[in-house]
Amino acid sequence: MDRDKILLTPGPLTTTLRTKLAMLKDWGSWDTDFNAVTASVRRSLLDIIHGHDSHVVVPLQGSGTFSVEAAVATLVPHDGHVLVLDNGAYCKRAVRLTQLMGRRCTVLPFDEAAPVSAAALADQLKADASISHVILIHCETGAGVLNPLQEVADVCAAHGKGLIVDAMSSFAALEIDARKVRFDALVAASGKCLEGVPGMGFVFIRKAILEGCAGRSQSLAMDLYDQYIYMEKTTQWRFTPPTHVVVALAEAIAQFEEEGGQPARLARYQRNYSTLITGMARLGFRPFLDPAIQAPIIVTFHAPADSRYEFKRFYASARERGFVLYPGKLTQVETFRVGCIGAIGPREMEQAVHAIAGALQDMGISSAAPAH
């Protein structure tokens, strides 16, 4: 196919032509026009969470995981104790990065097909007063589970614990209001539900704790406190910024606002999700999660029971038809994932279902029903 393939993944995503065209101009990293773009992006990001009074936002080069790691290193003191609420692969990544930077880390495990429990968190905090910070993955895209941010935030606030939220796959699609939800840090990135391109993360940090973060990070480039102070003083990034990514994000945010902001973005993703679920059910596919805990971000489907099914061939066939799927991330059952986000609508989701039907036909599979 001549046109770009549609990415049905949790990021990078399909972007609009306007976003792509924004990257055709070169920018100087110290140029006043570029610094103005950075400032505008930061203001717009704070607008989305209604956070101007309570938080600052610090952009950082790299993937979203860079910013998660930077947030933990900047916020958690060296003698701090982090509790990770674990119900999936991206929770386990948070555990690993916390351990690698030498912070004490405890894991509170949950089933990968269920949201984390605020009640279990409360019990753990009562049992271990040494815990200083809690890490929550808002939308655990390993399976697609939506975790209860408000309830977890309320428990952390009641116990005086710092909350670090990985909102990578929820920010700008699901409502997050800093006036209602108390968190010390919330992390997201350019290439997710804002529909920019990958290459920049950003961390919202509560103003009340900011000064206490000075000198905590053992990294030069990933010290969010130093990054913030330098930006406030100079309007510039400390080190070479991803100029094209920042400008593309500014354009993507403009389109986000034109669409109607977070409520409109969520409504489109929900339509995408409904179209996908209905179409896949016709083919015999069954989603892994109960709809009550499924975020309209990415959907995990059971693999067909048919012995002729093989994901690599299935993926390649769908890709030939213009759609890029995503492998499963679960440990116990064979699955694959289909994203509902990006610059796409129900029409593209219908086309994706048609492509998946063609992939099954290529493999000689008449029904995609799972084994159980």
UniProtKB/Swiss-Prot annotation:
Required cofactor names: pyridoxal 5'-phosphate
Pfam families documented for this protein: Aminotran_5
This protein's record includes keyword Transferase: yes
Entry-annotated residues carrying N6-(pyridoxal phosphate)lysine: K192
Molecular function terms, GO-annotated: 2-aminoethylphosphonate-pyruvate transaminase activity
Domain of life where this protein originates: Bacteria
InterPro entries xrefs: Aminotrans_V_dom (IPR000192), NH2EtPonate_pyrv_transaminase (IPR012703), PyrdxlP-dep_Trfase (IPR015424), PyrdxlP-dep_Trfase_major (IPR015421), PyrdxlP-dep_Trfase_small (IPR015422), SP_NH2Trfase/AEP_transaminase (IPR024169)
UniProt keyword annotation of Cell inner membrane present: no
Keyword annotations of the record: Aminotransferase, Pyridoxal phosphate, Pyruvate, Transferase
Catalytic activity: (2-aminoethyl)phosphonate + pyruvate = phosphonoacetaldehyde + L-alanine
Record-level GO BP terms: organic phosphonate catabolic process
UniProt-listed Enzyme Commission number(s): 2.6.1.37
Subunit structure comment from the entry: Homodimer.
PANTHER family named in the record: 2-AMINOETHYLPHOSPHONATE--PYRUVATE TRANSAMINASE
Function according to Swiss-Prot or TrEMBL: Involved in phosphonate degradation.
Family to which this protein belongs: Belongs to the class-V pyridoxal-phosphate-dependent aminotransferase family. PhnW subfamily.
Listed name of the protein: 2-aminoethylphosphonate--pyruvate transaminase 2
Lineage, highest ranks first: Bacteria, Pseudomonadati, Pseudomonadota, Betaproteobacteria, Burkholderiales
